């Protein structure tokens, strides 16, 4: 039988060659792993969470990830941010990660794939 399908939007916030990652709650999928934030409204999230305005927003093709009980369609939204405000220093459960550096911990597989794709875009290459 067909597995149920769930959908989510993930923000791939990029600033100064780094991407914003959050540690997921211990319970639930990818418990305790680092991931891109799942959001409802991207612009709102940028303003509230990053205290920043998105300069450029790009919607990527949906990425499907299969779990044993359901499929998850991830809609990645790449958001370029001009400057990282002091409000979002690295906290225990969020960090600015530079691809190529040692990761802060375990990273969810589809997130790792998205980071690799991002690493090959001009957004991140120009800073290396």
Roles of regions detected by a PLM:
Residues 1-128:
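Intrinsically disordered, low-complexity, charged terminal extensions of DNA damage-control enzymes
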């Amino acid at each position: 039988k067909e597995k149920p399908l769930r959908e989510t939007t993930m923000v791939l916030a990029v600033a100064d060659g780094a991407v914003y990652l959050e540690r997921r709650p211990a319970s639930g999928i990818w418990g305790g792993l680092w991931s891109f934030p799942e959001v409802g409204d991207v612009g709102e999230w940028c303003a509230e969470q990053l205290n920043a305005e998105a300069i450029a927003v790009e919607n990527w093709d949906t990425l499907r990830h299969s779990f044993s009980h359901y499929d998850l369609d991830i809609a990645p939204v790449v958001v370029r941010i001009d400057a990282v405000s002091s409000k979002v220093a690295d906290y225990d459960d969020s960090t600015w990660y530079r691809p190529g550096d040692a990761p802060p911990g375990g990273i969810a597989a589809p997130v790792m794939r998205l980071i690799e794709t991002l690493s090959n875009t001009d957004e991140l290459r120009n800073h290396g």
